[in-house]
Amino acid sequence: MEIVSMRDMLKAGVHFGHQTRYWNPKMKPFIFGSRNKVHIINLEKTLPMFNFALSELKKISLKKGKILFVGTKRAASKKIKETALNCNQFYVNHRWLGGMLTNWKTVRQSIKRLKDLETESQDGTFSKITKKEALIRTRELSKLENSLGGIKNMGGLPDCLFVIDAAHENIAIKEANNLGIPVFAIVDTNSNPDGVDYVIPGNDDAIRSVTLYLQAVSLSICKNQNGNSFSEMLLDSDKKMNIE
C-alpha cells in the first residue's frame, strides 16, 4: 500500500536537490533535470523507492527489530528524536561518536556510566557530595545523555539504520556497512549512494521534506497513531511549524 503520494512529495519540496555544481555523478539515475542551476530529483523514481523502503522497515518493526534513527544536523535533529521516541525506537541526533557501532563494547561501558550517574542524581547521592563534585557529575551526565541518551536502552546493535542525509552521516553508514547492518537513507544530489542498501533520493535539507520522511516512517512502524491519514498528519505538522 502506498503511504506517500506524489502530491505529498511535491508539496514538501522533496524534488529540490542541491546546486548543480555540487552534484555527485552517482546520483545521475535519480535526477530529472535542472532548474536555475539546481538539480531536480525525479520523484517517479523516489516515490516507489520510498514506499518500498517503508514496507521493509515495517517488516523489521513487526519482527520487533531495533531501528536506529540517525540525523545530527539541525534540520533533522528534533524530528529524529521525536519520531524514535514515538515509535519506541532509538536515535542519535547530536554528534555521531566514531565507533558507536564498531566499538560497541566501549560504548556499552559509557552507557553504564550514564545510567549510574542517572541513579545517583535521583537517589540523593549528589546531595551527599561536595557542590563542586556534584557539578562535575551533573555536567558529565548532561554530556553523556546528549551523546548516548537515544541508545542507552538499545541493549545491543541495531537491526538497521534510518539516516537523514547520507553525506553528513557517512561515518555512521560506514560503520553499519562494516557490520552488515542494513542502511535506509535519504540521499540528496550531492551525496554518494554507495553503502546505502535502501536509497531514497530526495531533499535532505528542508524541514518540510525531513518531516514528510519521518512521519511516513512513523505511520509505517508505530502502533500509537491516531488514525489520521498521511495528508492530515502533514497538515497538522505544518500548523505546528507555523506556530513555532
Curated annotation (Swiss-Prot):
A Gene Ontology biological process in which this protein takes part is: translation
For molecular function, the Gene Ontology terms on record are: structural constituent of ribosome
> Which keywords annotate this record?
Ribonucleoprotein, Ribosomal protein
Say which domain of life the source belongs to: Bacteria
- One cellular component GO annotation, for this chain's record? cytosolic small ribosomal subunit
Q: Which HAMAP family match?
A: Ribosomal_uS2_B
The family note in this entry says: Belongs to the universal ribosomal protein uS2 family.
Query: What protein does this entry describe?
Result: Small ribosomal subunit protein uS2
What taxonomic ancestry is recorded? Bacteria, Pseudomonadati, Pseudomonadota, Gammaproteobacteria, Enterobacterales
